[in-house]
Swiss-Prot record:
The keyword ATP-binding does not apply. The keyword Transcription regulation applies. This is HTH-type transcriptional regulator YidZ. Pfam families: HTH_1, LysR_substrate. Keywords: DNA-binding, Transcription, Transcription regulation. Residues 25-44 bind DNA. InterPro entries: LysR-type_TF, LysR_subst-bd, Tscrpt_reg_HTH_LysR, Tscrpt_reg_YidZ, WH-like_DNA-bd_sf, WH_DNA-bd_sf, YidZ_PBP2. PROSITE patterns: HTH_LYSR. It comes from Shigella dysenteriae serotype 1 (strain Sd197). Belongs to the LysR transcriptional regulatory family. Residues 8-65 form the HTH lysR-type domain.
Amino acid sequence: MKKSITTLDLNLLLCLQLLMQERSVTKAAKRMNVTPSAVSKSLAKLRAWFDDPLFVNSPLGLTPTPLMVSMEQNLAEWMQMSNLLLDKPHHQTPRGLKFELAAESPLMMIMLNALSKRLYQRYPQATIKLRNWDYDSLDAITRGEVDIGFSGRESHPRSRELLSSLPLAIDYEVLFSDVPCVWLRKDHPALHEKWDLDTFLRYPHISICWEQSDTWALDNVLQELGRERTIAMSLPEFEQSLFMAAQPDNLLLATAPRYCQYYNQLHQLPLVALPLPFDVSQQKKLEVPFTLLWHKRNSHNPKIVWLRETIKNLYASMA
């Protein structure tokens, strides 16, 4: 006997699609911002409605049954049509599009012109609001004041800025990973010395105040070695540290992400980049995963999905 769609909770179809994509109850639950138990209950309802197991457990995760495989394309088309329907209001001029970008202003400046052009092509009357990433930015995403954040996180096990430490309500995608390097003027005396940890620590440093902290993973690695750097100046932005390091007769060293080379070339600063004088395991702790962040409630918002994809494409073109 044919069943009526009125007897099916359509929210269950979203759950079904995510299960098909993730092949995992736990991962589907994370994307839906619910507990695995809730997803298991939804799967039980779907099995009863379709009178089919839909998925069976295997060492590789959930394996779809033949019925589920046969429905995959139809389900994807149904979800696409649903998104088009929900996108109708978003084709009206959106107000106050907000981008939350990393504190590293060079990262913002590298993409701002290209991003704004693409955004105005899609939404000609939209507005763009940019703010620097700071200690309150994750809360701003949670409060709905920011659509998307773009922030460098940290990899050191002792860091408070690990991806695994993000609030459960925040979804993310790593766009690229960077390893910081040392920036110094082209005629800096350190360039005439053996480049090692002693030379690195012999000169004064510029530190960046990151989310209300003057220290970061670099200082953690040095502490593990029983060493520390002399911080002569603290600044809020990386581009300011590059500018100061480039000044004539300045002995200051700036440590900033490698991507700052784009900013360097743009402004023709007389700087040279050297690798941090650490071994491979220590360098690994200093990796910075640059990450798009958004609230889970926006994971399927067509405007936000488009924005994420646009930013991803911009950075892919830079690689």
